[in-house]
A protein has these predicted regions:
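Radical SAM enzyme core and accessory elements
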Residues: 1-139, 216, 432-505
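Short beta-strand motif preference
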Residues: 53-55, 183, 299
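N-terminal [4Fe-4S]-dependent radical SAM core
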Residues: 99-104, 108-113, 134-181, 230
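Canonical Radical SAM [4Fe-4S] cluster-binding loop centered on the CxxxCxxC motif
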Residues: 178-213
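Conserved non-cysteine loop/helix-boundary elements of the Radical SAM core domain that shape
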Residues: 199-399
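Amphipathic, soluble alpha/beta structural segments
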Residues: 232, 237-241, 422-426, 490-505
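Flexible glycine/acidic-rich beta-alpha junction loops that bind and position SAM and/or redox cofactors
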Residues: 307, 311-312, 342-349, 364-390, ...
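A contiguous binding-surface segment within folded domains or other stable secondary-structure elements
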Residues: 398-414
């Protein structure tokens, strides 16, 4: 679609909206020609009081229009956000004007639907709720603002209210210098068909694992020195991947020992290890986790259908998940998470129902329902694998929510990813008391996350504001291992951020 901007250059927000509203269109900025089938002209002007935007939208012979005005108040930074919002809202209103005019056949061919999340394009649909509650609004006022300001339907707004309220409760438990810790293990037994993460297949890169673990431990120890000297307090720890389960018991023990020796964990009630694929789980590894006081383990089958596991490149069967969960239960960890993905190749609504029912039967108290995200580097896209359509994914999710509620689960966090099937969300469900606070903290951007390991993204949050900065570790295990100076630079930036924006009082 050709985009023409007059009086502004809000490319990013319009491109994000375009991705949601017109999933098959790519943005271009060439001059509009009379024969063009898809184009939109967005014109903005302003007075001292407000920003006024108009949209003219042409799509395969159909035309639509929209207008929107947003007050301009507050700081220059706040006014920039108000301008972006006005442009995005105007584009969305033009789409709403266009949609009912289009024949059903054209909608189907172009994969056009009314977005279930309204005009929200970000990965954190409930963040406006948390922010509104922080400002003193009632839950009903916060939900109504989501519906009127972002055009979110009632059902999705109610879900966002539930998870956003948990985010607000998480915020109240945090103090100014509280942080979370993350350790990444970027290795997997094999690469799944849906995955584009920078992770190494162990069968191809086994020799990298041991030097990686040594470099990781060195980073953890230097990070511990930094955290102690700056009087920061860890509140949650999460080891993810990749698949941490590829580590040997000795390697797991060494990493967790370094964590305990480097950080004061007396105020850290949550220690999570996403051990991952069930075929990597052994009694010896679970014994190590138990000895280090791990409070939550994550077993991630993604599906309990064997033919779906084969289709996505997993080399385990559903029986391996059953065996792994029996082992996990024997060690009596306080909390157990399981992950499922709706929309996998070869899956059906009936198969997804069987998978969810089996996870509930196996005793998880925390179940995350992901929706398949079509990532650019994944085998699904590169090989054109067939996946369930949006209606099938909707049927899967329509079964999940009431089934989990009936089993005593409530939603406690949600987030979106780009290129996600049907513009749905990932939702974390838990029984009361089973929430993973690290997940809430990172999805709601409530506190800084200090990340260790290759590809780690350290997020620095100024409490009580929207000011967030990031530094990134080197992506690949080999370059991470060979270039420790990058770690030193990132830790120096972390210290500088806290000295500048979160000084000790």
């Amino acid at each position: 679609m050709k985009l023409e901007f007059l009086g502004h250059d809000e490319r990013y927000i319009v491109e994000q909206s375009l991705m949601t509203l017109f999933p098959l269109e790519k943005p271009t900025y060439d001059a509009v020609q009379p024969e063009d089938e898809a184009w939109c002209r967005l014109a903005a002007g302003e007075t001292a009081a407000d920003c006024q935007v108009s949209a003219e939208l042409h799509y395969h012979g159909y035309t639509a229009a929209g207008t929107f005005a947003s007050p301009l108040t507050g700081t220059d930074f706040e006014k920039e956000g108000q301008r972006r919002y006005a442009v995005a809202a105007c584009f969305y209103l033009a789409f709403l004007d266009l949609y009912p005019k289009l024949p059903e056949a054209l909608r189907a061919a172009e994969k056009l639907t009314l977005p279930p999340g309204g005009m929200l394009t970000g990965v954190r649909p409930d963040k406006p709720i948390t922010r509104a509650l922080m400002e003193g609004k009632t839950p009903e006022e916060a939900k109504q603002e989501l519906k009127t300001r972002y055009f979110v339907p009632e059902e999705r707004a109610a879900l966002a209210l539930e998870t956003g309220a948990v985010g607000y409760q998480a915020l109240k438990r945090l103090e100014k210098r509280d942080i979370d810790l993350y350790v990444g293990i970027p290795f997997c037994p094999t690469r799944c068909a849906y995955c584009s993460f920078v992770s190494q297949s162990v069968e191809r890169s086994f020799s990298l694992v041991e030097p990686y673990v040594k470099a990781l431990i060195a980073e953890i120890r230097s990070g511990g020195d930094m955290v102690r000297s700056n009087r920061l307090r860890p509140r949650a720890f999460y080891m993810g991947g990749g698949t941490p389960g590829i580590l040997t018991p000795d390697q797991m023990d060494a990493i967790l020992t370094a964590l305990e020796e480097s950080f004061d964990l007396s105020a850290c009630p949550e220690i999570t290890v996403e051990i991952g694929r069930p075929d990597t789980i052994t009694a010896e590894k679970l014994a190590v986790l138990k000895s280090h006081g791990v409070t939550r383990v994550c077993v991630n089958p993604q599906t309990m259908e064997d033919h779906v596991l084969a289709a996505i490149g997993r080399r385990h069967a559903s029986a391996d998940t059953v065996r792994a969960m029996e082992l996990v239960r024997a060690y009596r960890f306080p909390h157990v998470n399981m992950d499922l993905i709706a929309g996998l190749p070869a899956d059906t609504p009936e198969g997804f129902r069987r998978s969810l029912d089996k996870c509930l039967e196996l005793g998880a108290d925390d179940i995350t329902i992901h929706t398949l995200a079509l990532k650019k580097g994944s085998r699904i896209l590169m090989e054109g694998l067939s996946i369930p359509d949006g209606a099938a994914v909707q049927a899967m999710l329509d079964y999940a929510a009431p089934t989990l509620r009936a089993a005593g689960f409530v939603p406690y966090y949600l987030y979106r990813q780009k290129y996600m099937s049907g513009s749905f969300e990932n939702v974390g469900w838990s029984r009361p008391g089973g929430e993973c606070w690290y997940n809430v903290d990172i999805m709601s951007e409530l506190c800084s996350i200090l990340s260790f390991g290759a590809g780690g993204s350290t997020k620095m949050v100024e409490p009580g504001t929207n000011h967030i900065e990031r530094v990134f570790n080197l992506k690949y295990p080999k370059e991470y291992t060979d270039r420790p100076e990058k770690i030193q630079q990132n830790q120096a930036a972390f210290v500088e951020f806290y000295q500048k924006y979160v000084p000790e009082t």
